[in-house]
From Swiss-Prot:
This protein's name: Probable molybdenum cofactor guanylyltransferase
Organism (species): Natronomonas pharaonis (strain ATCC 35678 / DSM 2160 / CIP 103997 / JCM 8858 / NBRC 14720 / NCIMB 2260 / Gabara)
Recorded GO MF terms: GTP binding; metal ion binding; molybdenum cofactor guanylyltransferase activity
Binding locations of GTP: V9, A10, G11, K22, N50, D77, D102
Keyword Cytoplasm among record annotations: yes
Top-tier EC class: transferase
Keyword Nucleotide-binding: yes
Cofactor: Mg(2+)
């Protein structure tokens, strides 16, 4: 397990949560990002957090004792493709799980399965419904970071664009259900989502 890193992408704007930085909001006594980190650390040894510079102090306090490496966006608010690129650029292990900072139900067993399936490929990316989940996937850091950089240089910030140049495998719904929980993909985007998470996790 010493060959794995977890990357939390936390640099997005919390537009549907008002002026609150949702990454550090309290969820039943634990900051949201720490809930994500705790679940991620069940299957990785190293933690990287991608964020804006103005978030770093708050996130460091929320993750005290977990010793994360911070990968700060040089240019903020360029979207998740840039966040993935920046986070993966600091990774030194062969594979890394990349997840969003707002997924409090992250399933370690499903992440373990993604690591297993990614072996010998550039990526293992779930598709629980019609859409891919690139912010709940496992990557070889260098190929994915390069693919993200190429997409951004081409002014194509769509989060699925980098996958087209990778040797990636798709994890379909049936395999997800067999090896984990679909709830793993649920995120906290609105005040209603936050209240639901507090009730479920209290």
């Amino acid at each position: 397990m010493g060959e794995r890193t977890g990357v939390i992408v936390a640099g997005g704007q919390s537009t549907r949560m008002g002026d609150v930085d949702k990454t550090v909001v309290d969820v039943a006594g634990v900051p949201l990002v720490r809930r994500v980190a705790n679940r991620l650390l069940a299957v990785v040894d190293h933690l990287v957090v991608n964020c804006r510079r103005d978030q770093q102090e708050r996130l460091a306090a929320a993750l005290e004792g977990l010793s994360p490496t911070f990968a700060v966006d040089e240019v903020p608010d360029r979207g998740p493709t840039a966040g993935i690129m920046t986070g993966l650029s600091t990774v030194e292990t062969p594979y890394a799980a990349v997840v969003a900072a707002d997924m409090p139900y992250l399933d370690p067993e499903l992440l373990e399965y993604l690591f297993e399936r990614a072996d010998s490929h550039d990526a293992a990316v779930p598709r629980p419904e019609e859409w891919f989940e690139p912010l709940h996937a496992v990557y070889r850091p260098e190929p994915m970071a390069e693919a993200c950089a190429e997409a951004l240089e081409a002014a194509d910030a769509r989060i699925i664009t980098p996958l087209s140049s990778l040797d990636h495998i798709v994890i379909e719904r049936d395999a997800i259900v067999e090896h984990g929980s679909l709830r793993s993909f649920e995120s906290v985007d609105t005040p209603e989502d936050l209240e639901r998470a507090r009730e479920r996790l209290s």
